């Protein structure tokens, strides 16, 4: 007998859907997002970057009478302004709409969905799940500051290596094909301002921290070693080194 999968449901009230419509909407987004819209699907995970490869936001994109790009409220205007720079060349209409969004966690994988559902978890719970899943949704403070490797995203989930050029593609390709990575993402269940190695030297780069449901987390981009704080060894609650040592 097969066991049923546990599904967690999260009510997400702090998200916006940006609609992109027009006969050339696909062509516009093909040059802006990291996924490949030539792969016919009704849902895409995508990253939008600037020309220097800094991540403007991650997103969930739905195909339904145009394209619905779901992002956090606080980065919605930023992404809209970026897309509108190019929309005049593609005869597209771009608007922002508030629609019901919820999230699901199933078999350790997270996905946003459109619609109303009676969920027993909220946006704060979602933030924690995303933090531990290395898939945190970009907020205003993070937008345009970090590159994709510093955020710990699964590149296979967000990026197509078969499509042609898109904004930030050259930098992403360079980060991907540099060879063996010397730094990856680790997450601690405490808000550390800095971490040290066994020689008491400050190491790594703090990317962001999260306080939610009376819990603290911190996310660092750092080499694979033993980590210390105030002379005591500290253990990450999740990290890329264990998830994929060959990444």
Regions found by a protein language model. Name each.
Residues 157, 163-164:
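Residue "hotspots" at secondary-structure boundaries inside conserved domains
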Residues 140-152, 163, 178:
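Short, basic/aromatic beta-hairpin or loop at an interaction surface
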Residues 25-63:
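A glycine-rich (often HGG/GG-containing) alpha/beta subdomain
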Residues 24-29, 76-80, 117-120, 192-198, ...:
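Short, conserved charged micro-motifs
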Residues 4-21, 40, 57-137, 239:
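Acidic, low-complexity central loop/insert segments
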Residues 1-6, 44-58, 200-207:
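Short amphipathic beta-strand starts and helix->beta connectors
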Residues 55, 129, 133-137, 151-158, ...:
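Glycine-rich, small/acidic residue-mixed loop/short-helix segments
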């Amino acid at each position: 007998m097969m066991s049923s999968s546990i599904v967690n449901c999260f009510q997400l009230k702090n998200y916006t859907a940006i609609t992109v419509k027009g006969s050339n909407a696909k062509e516009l987004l093909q040059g802006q997002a990291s996924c490949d819209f030539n792969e016919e699907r009704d849902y895409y995970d995508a990253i939008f970057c600037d020309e220097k490869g800094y991540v403007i936001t991650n997103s969930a994109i739905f195909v339904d009478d145009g394209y619905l790009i779901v992002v956090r409220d606080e980065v919605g205007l930023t992404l809209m302004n970026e897309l509108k720079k190019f929309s005049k060349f593609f005869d597209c209409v771009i608007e922002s709409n508030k629609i019901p969004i919820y999230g699901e966690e199933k078999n350790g994988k997270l996905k946003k969905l459109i619609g109303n559902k009676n969920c027993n978890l909220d946006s704060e719970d979602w933030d924690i799940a995303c933090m531990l899943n290395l898939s945190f949704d970009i907020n205003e403070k993070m937008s345009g500051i970090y590159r994709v490797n510093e955020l710990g995203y699964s590149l296979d989930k967000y990026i197509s290596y078969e499509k042609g050029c898109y904004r930030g593609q050259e930098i992403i390709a360079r980060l991907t094909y540099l060879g063996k990575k010397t730094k990856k993402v680790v997450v601690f269940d405490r808000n550390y301002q800095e971490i040290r190695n066994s020689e008491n030297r400050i190491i790594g780069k703090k990317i962001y921290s999260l306080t939610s449901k009376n819990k603290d987390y911190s996310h660092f981009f750092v080499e694979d070693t033993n980590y210390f704080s105030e002379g005591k060894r500290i253990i990450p609650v999740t990290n890329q080194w264990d998830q994929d040592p060959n990444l």
